[in-house]
Each structure stands twice: as C-alpha cells, then as structure tokens.
C-alpha cells in the first residue's frame, strides 16, 4: 500500500514539475487593416502552470494575487505583410518571448482576461500562410 501511495505522490510531483511555466511555439495571426488579410507566423510565448491558491475566506486587507505564466524577457521581430497598398506601412512588429516566469499579469502589455480573442483571431476572412 505504501508503494502505491508513493507512486501516486511521485506522479503528482512529476506532473507539476513537467508542466511548469516554459517557452512554447505558437502560431499567431498577423493583420494590418490597410492590407485587408491576415498571415500566420510562428513565434514563441510562455505557457504552463504556476503555483497559486484561491482562499475560501476573502480578506479585504490582504489582496488575492494570482500568479500567471508570463514573459520575463522579450525581443521584437518584424515581418512584412504582403499585399498592402503602396502608401501603407506593410511592416508589422510582434513580441517573441525569450524567457518565462510565474508572475503578476501586467495589463499594460498583456491580455489578462479569462478568455481573450486568441492568437489565431483574424478580422478578415482571408488567411495566408
């Protein structure tokens, strides 16, 4: 019986450690209104789980701050969106995460909502790879 409990605890520990906050490859839709269509690009972003807790009894004197998996370091890359009008700026700059950590959500630079539009959302019907 003790070996079963040990195996269970070990599997739980392994699941938590292996699903930590880390870089992951994602595909995002890039669009420029002047170009009237979207392109898909590959980039890296942070994904995974962070230790957090939600208290049953809320204490107004002690705010409940949830940690999220977010970027620690960013670089920016630029891509040219094809098909833009000659007078339009066809360059699009997007963030690429280079390091991740568990921290507070910075609403100035991150969509902190429960459900955002998602990285593959496109306002236009046409998507180019």
Swiss-Prot record:
Chief location: secreted
Molecular-function annotations in GO: follicle-stimulating hormone activity
Organism whose genome encodes this protein: Oryctolagus cuniculus
Domain of life per record: Eukaryota
InterPro entries: Cystine-knot_cytokine, Glyco_hormone_CN, Gonadotropin_bsu, Gonadotropin_bsu_CS
Annotated CDD domains: GHB_like
Protein name: Follitropin subunit beta
Pfam families the UniProt entry points to: Cys_knot (PF00007)
Positions annotated with a glycan in the UniProt record: 25, 42
Any one GO cellular component localisation term in the record: extracellular space
Classification via Gene3D superfamilies: Cystine-knot cytokines
UniProt subcellular location: Secreted
Family: Belongs to the glycoprotein hormones subunit beta family.
Signal peptide interval: 1-18
Record function comment: Together with the alpha chain CGA constitutes follitropin, the follicle-stimulating hormone, and provides its biological specificity to the hormone heterodimer. Binds FSHR, a G protein-coupled receptor, on target cells to activate downstream signaling pathways. Follitropin is involved in follicle development and spermatogenesis in reproductive organs.
Alphabetized UniProt keyword annotations: Disulfide bond, Glycoprotein, Hormone, Secreted, Signal
SMART domains, per database record: GHB
Assembly information from the UniProt record: Heterodimer. The active follitropin is a heterodimer composed of an alpha chain/CGA shared with other hormones and a unique beta chain/FSHB shown here.
Biological process, per Gene Ontology: follicle-stimulating hormone signaling pathway; G protein-coupled receptor signaling pathway; positive regulation of bone resorption; positive regulation of gene expression; positive regulation of steroid biosynthetic process; regulation of osteoclast differentiation; regulation of signaling receptor activity; Sertoli cell proliferation
Disulfide bonds, paired cysteine numbers: 21-69, 35-84, 38-122, 46-100, 50-102, 105-112
